């Protein structure tokens, strides 16, 4: 299975293409689309869509995972992020790909087991799960890879009938997708 994870932003949009095969993960592509603040917002959205379209055409993901919008006190920033998300969703729909959306807290919980994990903790676990020698920079890249990994883990839960783990305060050992991942991927999990 190949999943494209997208961490949308109006100045930086991270993307990561992750393949899951026989219980192991590999990165096919990852990067950040950097945009200039001086460019018009419609121009930036167009560039994001063109770049992501090239990624979709080259790697042909089976589905796309997108981070949901966060609550912002800056109305203009929230509107711009919503426009970027809408454009990405429109692009994905045009390719008839299924799209799944995940809140940042859900991604953190799926990757680290804690919904309140720091970006550094997420980046560390993403690099471990993907057997990377270094942590990808900037955080937009590791966030996008984490979103793709979250989708793969949640997809396994959907297929197996295990409910997704949405509340990070649940007691461990209750059968959430993180526990399932650990059981199914002994070669990926780092044990101390």
Swiss-Prot record:
Provide any one GO MF term from the record.
Answer: magnesium ion binding
**Under the cellular component aspect of Gene Ontology, which terms does the record hold?**
cytoplasm; Holliday junction resolvase complex
Q: Where is this region: Disordered?
A: 158-192
- Requisite cofactors: Mg(2+)
Catalytic activity, per the record? Endonucleolytic cleavage at a junction such as a reciprocal single-stranded crossover between two homologous DNA duplexes (Holliday junction)
Indicate where this protein resides in the cell: Cytoplasm
Q: What is its EC number?
A: 3.1.21.10
Q: Quote the catalytic residue positions.
A: 7, 67, 140
Q: Where is the composition biased (Polar residues)?
A: 182-192
- Name a single GO biological process: DNA repair
Top class in the EC scheme? hydrolase
Textual note on the cofactor: Binds 2 Mg(2+) ion per subunit.
Q: Name one Pfam family in it.
A: RuvC
Binding positions (Mg(2+) 2): 67
- The domain of life is Bacteria
| Binding-site list for Mg(2+) 1 | 7, 140
Principal place of residence: cytoplasm
Q: Which UniProt keywords apply?
A: Cytoplasm, DNA damage, DNA recombination, DNA repair, DNA-binding, Endonuclease, Hydrolase, Magnesium, Metal-binding, Nuclease
The record's annotation in InterPro entries points to: RNaseH-like_sf (IPR012337), RNaseH_sf (IPR036397), X-over_junc_endoDNase_Mg_BS (IPR020563), X-over_junc_endoDNase_RuvC (IPR002176)
Function summary = The RuvA-RuvB-RuvC complex processes Holliday junction (HJ) DNA during genetic recombination and DNA repair. Endonuclease that resolves HJ intermediates. Cleaves cruciform DNA by making single-stranded nicks across the HJ at symmetrical positions within the homologous arms, yielding a 5'-phosphate and a 3'-hydroxyl group; requires a central core of homology in the junction. The consensus cleavage sequence is 5'-(A/T)TT(C/G)-3'. Cleavage occurs on the 3'-side of the TT dinucleotide at the point of strand exchange.
- Family per UniProt? Belongs to the RuvC family.
NCBIfam families from the xrefs?
ruvC
Subunit composition and interactions:
Homodimer which binds Holliday junction (HJ) DNA. The HJ becomes 2-fold symmetrical on binding to RuvC with unstacked arms; it has a different conformation from HJ DNA in complex with RuvA. In the full resolvosome a probable DNA-RuvA(4)-RuvB(12)-RuvC(2) complex forms which resolves the HJ.
Q: Per its record, how is this protein called by name?
A: Crossover junction endodeoxyribonuclease RuvC
The organism that produces this protein has a lineage beginning with: Bacteria, Pseudomonadati, Chlorobiota, Chlorobiia, Chlorobiales
């Amino acid at each position: 299975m190949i999943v494209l994870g997208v961490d949308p932003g109006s100045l930086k949009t991270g993307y990561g293409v992750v393949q899951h095969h026989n219980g192991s993960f590999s990165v096919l592509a990852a990067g950040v689309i950097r945009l200039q603040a001086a460019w018009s917002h419609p121009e930036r959205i167009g560039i994001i869509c063109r770049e992501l379209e090239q990624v979709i055409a080259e790697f042909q993901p089976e589905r796309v995972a997108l981070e949901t919008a966060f609550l912002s006190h800056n109305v203009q920033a929230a509107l711009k992020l919503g426009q970027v998300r809408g454009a990405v969703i429109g692009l994905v729909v045009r390719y008839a790909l299924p799209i799944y959306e995940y809140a940042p807290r859900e991604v953190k919980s799926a990757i680290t087991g804690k919904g309140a994990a720091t970006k550094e903790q997420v980046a560390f676990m993403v690099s471990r799960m993907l057997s990377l020698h270094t942590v990808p920079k900037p955080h937009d890249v590791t966030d996008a890879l984490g979103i793709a990994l979250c989708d793969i883990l949640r997809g396994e839960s959907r297929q197996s009938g295990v409910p997704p783990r949405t509340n990070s305060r649940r007691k461990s050992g209750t059968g959430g997708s993180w526990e399932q991942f650990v059981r199914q991927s002994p070669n990926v999990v780092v044990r101390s």
